[in-house]
Amino acid sequence: MINRYFITGTDTNIGKTISVCALLQYLNKLGNKSVGCKLISSGCKKIKNKIFNEDVVNIMKYNNIKFKYKDINPFAFLEKTAPHIASKRKNIFINHILLSNKLNKFLNYDIDYLIIEGFGGWKVPINSNSMYSEWVSNEKLPIILVVGIKLGCINHALLTIESIKNSNAIILGWIANHLEKDLINKNDYFKYLKKVIKYPLIGKIPFIKNKKNFSNLHKYIFLKKVI
């Protein structure tokens, strides 16, 4: 049976992708067959009539089972906006059934861990009537919350956790991702979050200057606390 984790964040551009890459590297080091995917992406680039998302390309570097791009990122949009807007403008209707069908394709493969990167924060509409978070809850996907350490992160983290709990979703743990090198009081923010978040801290990623080099991130993950 595949162990499936869903990675959400306290906001967009908060470090979900770097966290997925770190988790994949950690799991690979333990000898697991690990795959990361991002079902929906926007802000993509078009190269030779093919659409690619930079986050997805980074994730695919650390998949030790190889898939075609369209399997890892079935819904990719050029416009950098919310899924319900981008998909409507392309006359593509995304719903829960479609997402489940795309996810279930991985069940046909010998995979130990499937890491699913979400889109933006927790509450994101995929069409005019449905939220991404509702699908995650229905699929009973254990959630790893990425908290970007910055001014306002305490409020963002606690509100997101409250919303996830109200959705009857399962929180596996959280990852602290440092977004700014010289953030004032960053250690105080982290210490407070560690005290008030009643879920295991499974990763602490320092500020990474080179956003194109996600290697050697496994050392910042301690997932063994919860698996």
Curated annotation (Swiss-Prot):
Residues annotated as binding ATP are 13-18, 55, 117-120, 177-178, 206-208, 213
Q: Which reaction does it catalyse?
A: (7R,8S)-7,8-diammoniononanoate + CO2 + ATP = (4R,5S)-dethiobiotin + ADP + phosphate + 3 H(+)
- Similarity field: Belongs to the dethiobiotin synthetase family.
In the UniProt record, the gene name given for this protein reads bioD
In the UniProt record, the signal sequence range is: none
Q: Where does substrate bind?
A: S42
Q: Does the keyword Ligase apply?
A: yes
Task: Quote the pathway field.
Answer: Cofactor biosynthesis; biotin biosynthesis; biotin from 7,8-diaminononanoate: step 1/2
Under the GO molecular function aspect, what terms does this record hold?
ATP binding; dethiobiotin synthase activity; magnesium ion binding
Active site as annotated: K38
Tell me the GO BP annotations in alphabetical order: biotin biosynthetic process
Classification via Pfam families: AAA_26
Q: What class of enzyme is it?
A: ligase
What function does this protein fulfil? Catalyzes a mechanistically unusual reaction, the ATP-dependent insertion of CO2 between the N7 and N8 nitrogen atoms of 7,8-diaminopelargonic acid (DAPA, also called 7,8-diammoniononanoate) to form a ureido ring.
> Which residue stretches, if any, does this entry annotate as coiled coil?
none
Task: Write down what this protein is called.
Answer: ATP-dependent dethiobiotin synthetase BioD
- Residues binding Mg(2+) are T17, D55, E117
Q: What is its EC number?
A: 6.3.3.3
The cofactor required is: Mg(2+)
Protein keywords: ATP-binding, Biotin biosynthesis, Cytoplasm, Ligase, Magnesium, Metal-binding, Nucleotide-binding
Question: Which cysteines bridge via disulfide bonds?
Answer: none
Concerning InterPro entries, the annotation shows: DTB_synth_BioD, P-loop_NTPase
